């Protein structure tokens, strides 16, 4: 499938709203479900998705509550709620077991889904996720609160983050167009409510990893600006999940976009070992 073509959007109706997704519909091994980070869309995987499908995998990408082509206003935007959406999507598609991958905020969602429904999850992948972070101190909480307020009231700040921080190395050829789309999406009526729901949620829950029994892979960009010491965070997550760890040299917070080939190689090796 040509990665430059937009996949066909399908929808799952749930209590409270509608979730958008796409599905290649065929492939070898357990299907792979890719979840974007907060305030993003499933197009975050536009460069990784074709590499996985070219390798023969069935790939499903899903928009989160409030963003992409999903319904905008929900009563809950938490990682746990998103975990429930993923499991509902598996039911909807008649999938018994899948590999779940989550970036950033939704790393917690795939961990929660694996703990809640171990029989449904063949493996999990954390892509620069916030799971099992060291709890922030008082000053850090103040800084995070200020940043959250900026995101809610100033979509341009989200654009600044993507243009100046999130991609410390190479940027995708379509980067500027993509970032402009992210900023425009935040200005859609109702998105302020959705943004507030995400920035006030617990994106880094601790303790959830204890319930995970499936194989896990931790992928981390070596230059992720969201973490002072990215490899230390990856080590903590890998230890909590008894997981394989892969550092993507030079990658930022979105390795599937700035280093898609290296990210695909890490995922495909993990998937091969699950067979």
Task: Give the residues covered by each predicted segment.
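Conserved alpha/beta-hydrolase catalytic His-Asp/Glu region
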Residues: 135-137, 153-211
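Conserved HGGG/HGGXW glycine-rich cap/lid loop of the alpha/beta-hydrolase fold
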Residues: 24-69
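Flexible "cap/lid" loop of the alpha/beta hydrolase fold
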Residues: 115, 122-152
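Hydrolases whose catalytic domains are alpha/beta-hydrolase-1, hotdog thioesterase
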Residues: 109-113
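Conserved loop-alpha-helix segment in the C-terminal half of the alpha/beta-hydrolase fold
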Residues: 217-251
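Active-site loop/oxyanion-hole signature of alpha/beta-hydrolase fold enzymes
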Residues: 46, 54, 61-101, 105
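Catalytic active-site module of serine/aspartate enzymes centered on a nucleophile-bearing elbow/loop
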Residues: 241-275
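Alpha/beta-hydrolase fold catalytic core
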Residues: 1-32, 54-57, 95-96, 122, ...
């Amino acid at each position: 499938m040509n990665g430059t073509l937009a996949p066909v959007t399908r929808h799952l109706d749930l209590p409270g709203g509608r979730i958008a997704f796409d599905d290649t519909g065929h492939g070898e091994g357990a299907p792979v479900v890719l979840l974007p980070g907060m305030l993003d869309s499933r197009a975050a995987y536009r460069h990784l998705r074709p590499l996985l499908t070219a390798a023969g995998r069935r790939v499903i990408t899903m928009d989160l509550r409030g963003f992409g082509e999903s319904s905008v206003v929900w009563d809950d935007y938490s990682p746990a709620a998103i975990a429930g959406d993923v499991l509902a999507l598996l039911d909807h598609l008649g999938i018994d077991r899948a590999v779940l991958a989550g970036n950033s905020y939704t790393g917690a969602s795939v961990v929660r889904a694996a703990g809640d429904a171990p029989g449904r999850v063949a493996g999990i992948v954390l892509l620069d996720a916030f799971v099992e972070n060291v709890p922030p101190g008082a000053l850090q909480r103040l800084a995070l609160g200020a940043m959250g307020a900026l995101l809610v009231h100033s979509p341009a700040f989200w654009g600044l983050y993507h243009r100046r921080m999130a991609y410390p190395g190479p940027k995708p050829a379509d980067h500027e167009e993509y970032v402009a789309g992210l900023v425009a999406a935040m200005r859609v009526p109702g998105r302020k409510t959705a943004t507030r729901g995400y920035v006030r949620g617990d994106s880094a829950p601790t303790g959830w990893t204890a319930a995970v029994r499936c194989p896990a892979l931790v992928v981390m960009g070596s230059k992720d600006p969201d973490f002072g010491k990215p490899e230390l965070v990856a080590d903590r997550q890998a230890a909590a999940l008894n997981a394989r760890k892969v550092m993507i040299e030079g990658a930022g917070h979105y390795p599937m976009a700035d280093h898609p080939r290296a990210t695909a190689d890490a995922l495909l090796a993990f998937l091969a070992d699950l067979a």
